Amino acid sequence: RQRQMCIRDSNIPLVVDNTFATPYLVRPIEYGADIVVHSATKFIGGHGTTIGGVIIDSGKFDWTQNDKWPWLVEPNVSYHGVSFAKDCAPAAFATYIRAILLRDTGATISPVHSFIFLQGLETLSLRVERHVENALKVVQYLKDQPLVEKVNHPSISEDKEQQELYKKYFPNGGGSIFTFEIKGGAKEAQKFIDNLELFSLLANVADVKSLAIHPASTTHSECNEAELLDQGIKPNTIRLSIGTENVDDIIEDLDEAFKALAE
């Protein structure tokens, strides 16, 4: 809320990336967001087969209140003097993206990819519900696992303020993508991942398949140690994206990997 007030005082729009939460878990516009973005490749598509994104303009932000957005306020020559902020309100930002950015970049999604995303939306609530249900059980399993130092998931936060925020904003659950820290270092983390069989070793997330990765040596390998720690990534950090498989199978796979690590 303090950040939101700061943003309001600065007269800049509040943009929220809601990819991991999805509209099923939280709707940022209802809490004051001006623009919401999604990587549709993740939960919306659901199967890691299609690349695309979504930008949602709430229509609540006044782009004419200062001189920070001349490209939206000033007359556009290519559209015969149209001012997107004045003539296309309240959907000024969305209209600008369609009329200018898509025209200039050619980033138009193909019909078949659009079809795949629309199909994904039909089962979004069912899939995310299962993702979250499985994730909560996996979190509890990892929390009680002696070879785990820490599990980073909002459902088990010991911070009272975080608990209250979690209950307020995530009544349907805190998502299925999280990290945990295994006892040891990078060597132990990589050995654990190498012994997973049901989990796929992929950098993607939010797939119906359960995914695991070692961020320090993959997605964030270009960062130095200080930069990694600044982002909450340690050598023993493992990221999981819990899928929709039978949760007993998921936990059994994790259990077998821990047994291999203990040998």
Language model: regions and residue ranges:
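Conserved PLP phosphate-binding loop immediately N-terminal to the Schiff-base lysine helix
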Residues: 1, 12-46
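Active-site C-terminal subdomain of aminotransferase-like
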Residues: 35-38, 44-177, 181-210
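Residues that form or flank phosphate/diphosphate-binding pockets in enzymes
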Residues: 23, 187, 249
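Active-site beta-loop-alpha junctions enriched in small/polar residues
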Residues: 19-21, 156, 183, 243-245
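PLP-dependent enzyme catalytic core of the Aspartate aminotransferase-like
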Residues: 1, 127, 194-195, 210-263
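Buried hydrophobic positions in well-ordered alpha/beta secondary-structure cores of metabolic enzymes
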Residues: 14-17, 28, 53, 131, ...
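Short, surface-exposed connector motifs at secondary-structure boundaries
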Residues: 8-12, 123
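Short, small-residue-biased leader/transition segments that mark boundaries at the very start
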Residues: 2-7
